[in-house]
Structure formats: structure tokens, C-alpha cells
């Protein structure tokens, strides 16, 4: 287990890649967020540390490894529909998810410019019924098993962006 908010996270990922003998797919599923209408600064900064700095630390490490080894690779990340349509009750969460969307788009452009065979899949689910939102009253929560199947399908089909919420999938 790697704590992506720690400075050694990049080194730990590289060690894991070495132990496995390489990497074809980096799958990023890490994030935190709260409804924070009072703008509790600790919650806002923890969200930025995990969803912003931690995200960059890990995704950039995976990208650099794939680029440096000239391997065909695939970087798939669970972001959120909140990056597409901001949620006023969760400003840091929505903002960091938008950052993730753009960061992946930029790395995808860079890979094409450098003629690197690295694919990207930005997975944007809506509200998934998980422990992260347990006890809160989010509308139309998505079944976690169905979302998991949609994620696997998006990765296997090498989709660039996969919105998993019928309300936003236009």
C-alpha cells in the first residue's frame, strides 16, 4: 500500500514496478473529498494534497517509466463527473477532479507529440454507492459492481474518456 501524499510514494511505485518486472497498465484509484460548504481549510488542503499533488506524483511517475522504457502503456485514472460539472458543496473536490481531467489530457497530448505509445483513459463516474459517500444523501447513486464493469470495459476498449453516469453521458 502506498500513501500517495508522502514524498516516498514515487520511489515505492518504482520499486513495485521493478518487482513486477515492468508495467503495462497504471490504474489510479485514489482520492478523497467532502462536502465542505464552510470551507474548512484542513479539508480543502487534504483534498488538494491527495487529489492534486498525490495524483501528479503517481501519474507522472508511471508516465516517466513508460516513456523511459519505450513501452506501450496505458494510464487509466478514476477522476469524477465532478470535474466536468462543479459541485458547489465540494469546491476542492470538484476543482481537483477538473485538474486531473486536464492533466491527463495534457499528458496524452505530450505522448502524441513525443510519439510515445502511451494511452490514457479518464474514467468519470457519478455518485457511486461506496463508503466514501455512505451516510450522505446523494441523488441516484450508482451500483458499485456495474461501475466496476464499466471501468474494465473502458480500459479494455482503450476509451479516452468514459463518463459513467447517464445524466452526463451526452
Where are these regions (language model features)?
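C-terminal helical subdomain
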Residues: 122, 134-169
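Active-site helix of classical SDR
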Residues: 59, 96
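Residue(s) in the substrate-gating loop at a strand-loop-helix junction
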Residues: 80
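Conserved NAD(P)H cofactor-binding loop of Rossmann-fold oxidoreductase domains
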Residues: 29-35
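Rossmann-fold cofactor-recognition segment
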Residues: 1-8
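Short alpha-helical oligomerization interface
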Residues: 36-49
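Active-site loop immediately N-terminal to the catalytic Tyr-X3-Lys motif
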Residues: 85-91, 136
Amino acid at each position: 500500500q502506498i500513501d500517495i501524499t508522502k514524498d516516498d510514494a514515487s520511489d515505492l511505485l518504482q520499486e513495485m514496478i521493478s518487482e513486477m518486472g515492468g508495467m503495462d497498465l497504471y490504474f489510479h484509484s485514489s482520492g478523497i473529498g467532502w462536502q465542505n460548504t464552510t470551507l474548512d481549510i484542513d479539508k480543502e488542503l487534504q483534498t488538494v494534497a491527495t487529489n492534486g499533488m498525490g495524483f501528479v506524483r503517481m501519474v507522472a511517475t508511471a508516465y516517466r517509466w513508460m516513456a523511459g522504457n519505450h513501452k506501450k502503456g496505458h494510464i487509466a485514472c478514476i477522476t469524477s463527473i465532478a470535474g466536468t460539472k462543479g459541485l458547489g458543496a465540494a469546491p476542492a473536490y470538484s476543482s481537483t477532479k477538473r485538474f486531473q481531467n486536464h492533466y491527463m489530457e495534457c499528458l496524452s497530448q505530450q505522448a502524441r507529440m513525443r510519439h510515445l505509445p502511451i494511452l490514457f483513459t479518464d474514467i468519470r463516474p457519478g455518485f457511486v454507492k461506496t463508503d466514501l459517500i455512505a451516510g450522505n444523501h446523494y441523488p441516484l447513486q450508482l451500483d458499485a459492481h456495474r461501475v466496476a464493469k464499466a471501468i474494465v470495459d473502458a480500459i479494455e476498449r482503450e476509451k479516452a474518456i468514459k463518463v459513467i453516469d447517464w445524466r452526463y453521458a451526452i
